Amino acid sequence: MAPGMIMGGAAAKPDLNDVTYDAFLANDRTLGDPEVVKVEPGGRVLLRIINSSSMSAFHVDLGALDGELIAVDGFPVAPVVARRFLIAVAQRLDIRLALPRAPAAYPVLAVLEGESRQTGIILQAGGAPIARIPDTAAMASAALTLDLERRLRAVAPLEPRKADRRHTLNLTGNMVSYVWSLNNVAWTKDTPPLPIAKGERVELLFVNQTPMPHPMHLHGHEFQVVEINDERFSGAVRDTVLVPPGHRVVVAFDANNPGLWALHCHLLYHLDAGMFTTLRYV
């Protein structure tokens, strides 16, 4: 199935924000009264950006600053330099900044996916005056894509090895019934765990058959992104990967942490509606 297509071949128009909120916060504050972090002109700053929202993805906007992305979900990646970065629900970004020597105020903003509403903090270098930042950007942002994911390369990738087992997980559901599921099965306490065995290299193929993006999160393990839309590569090691509508993403992990572990969409309303399963091994 081609990217951006849903079952039956119809063109997909992503449904990006199915829950509306009154405000978006950065460290518990809006841009009406943002957190101001005092920094040194010419200094270096490490931003750790955590998308702890329940249902909202963002574009991180550094304005005039070049940011160096050095880790995702706590795992180092080869540096990627940009001024905007995409962050899905539950993902984390470590971004290193080298500030100019002149005093200035630098907004670090998060623009809601598909909309213009935004939040953020202010880096204040050398006591520079701070202008009020509007809570809407000049223009709406686009839907999140996998463009950044394709560029990421793990500093410490998994050892090369053939997979012992692969599970295909079709991401299923719709906005009408608001039942979200895996392989058309909404999880209950009677749903059996995915079968795997200790020591195996396991691949999970996520196929998004819905009009919404889903950030898929695995507990107890890190995985490596190894394939997007049938193109193999050695991507980032992380624990949450976005699967946009009509896309296919493969992740690989080693079964080296026995127990009962959750695997689910991190959009909390989707998790609660049934897009959840477990894996268990001893």
Which ranges hold each PLM region?
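Histidine- and aromatic-rich segments of cupredoxin/plastocyanin-like copper-binding domains
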Residues: 2-146, 159-160, 229-232
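A Trp-anchored, charged/polar loop motif used as the substrate-binding/catalytic surface
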Residues: 29-31, 151, 187
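A short glycine/threonine-centered beta-strand motif
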Residues: 51-53, 152-154, 208-210
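Active-site pocket scaffolds in enzymes
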Residues: 69-83, 162-282
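Compositionally biased low-complexity segments at domain edges in trafficked proteins
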Residues: 137-166, 173-175
